Amino acid sequence: MNIAVVTDSTAYIPKEMREQHQIHMIPLQVVFREETYREEIELDWKSFYEEVKKHNELPTTSQPPIGELVALYEELGKSYDAVISIHLSSGISGTFSSAAAADSMVDNIDVYPFDSEISCLAQGFYALKAAELIKNGASSPEDIIKELEEMKKTVRAYFMVDDLAHLQRGGRLSSAQAFIGSLLKVKPILHFDNKVIVPFEKIRTRKKAISRIYELLDEDASKGLPMRAAVIHANREEEAAKIIEELSAKYPHVEFYNSYFGAVIGTHLGEGALGICWCFK
């Protein structure tokens, strides 16, 4: 059985890596001043942060139109028998639900939607795993889904924001909490819990927040088992590179990626956000 892998743009897997692993991508949409852009295709992360700075306003975001999902699946149906369609958490987007609905609209391929319950390159790790399983001979979509569900036990992601105002605008914090938090220089560490973004711990400074995320990574990385990990930044590429250099020296058994919060996720976290995600291979 020929099985395809699809993910959406919020996995932030670079184009070259998608092509290398034969991973197909459906973009979410970003609306800037009434202009609609397809994330990662018509708007990359660098252009997004430049636009936000230039106009001092944030875009709105939306899931892919269901017609685009149907069209992608039908096109894949010409070469494949089934598709594993991996998407950002259903708790923050309707993309997974749209993929499930699109399944009933296509006849030439079986669609297996998968809710990653997370986003960014942590979501991308599921797509990479699915592609590896297929390359290594997996021929049952059900078995691949089972492996991905098992993988949820080891996927971790923690991140911090530089400006609480973005969380407040998105309804994550009250205005009073954001104001007081800014005065106290609180840098909340966030994570996904039950499919939504929630505070994990409140830390007083950026430096201490990053140190705490290091500690959380060490709980798994110190076991010495092969792992994937990514340092994810919101327009802080050099800072992410320095962190990777430091962590790679400490954990040579971990494969590190320098990744980013693109337009859709960056809209909700704001420039300066930083996180680390990881999983066992």
UniProtKB/Swiss-Prot annotation:
Keywords: Lipid-binding
Domain DegV as annotated: residue spans: 3-280
InterPro entries, per the entry: DegV, DegV_C, DegV_domain_contain
Keyword presence, Aminoacyl-tRNA synthetase: no
Molecular-function annotations in GO: lipid binding
Domain of life: Bacteria
General function of this protein: Binds long-chain fatty acids, such as palmitate, and may play a role in lipid transport or fatty acid metabolism.
Full protein name: Protein DegV
Organism per entry: Bacillus subtilis (strain 168)
Gene name of the record: degV
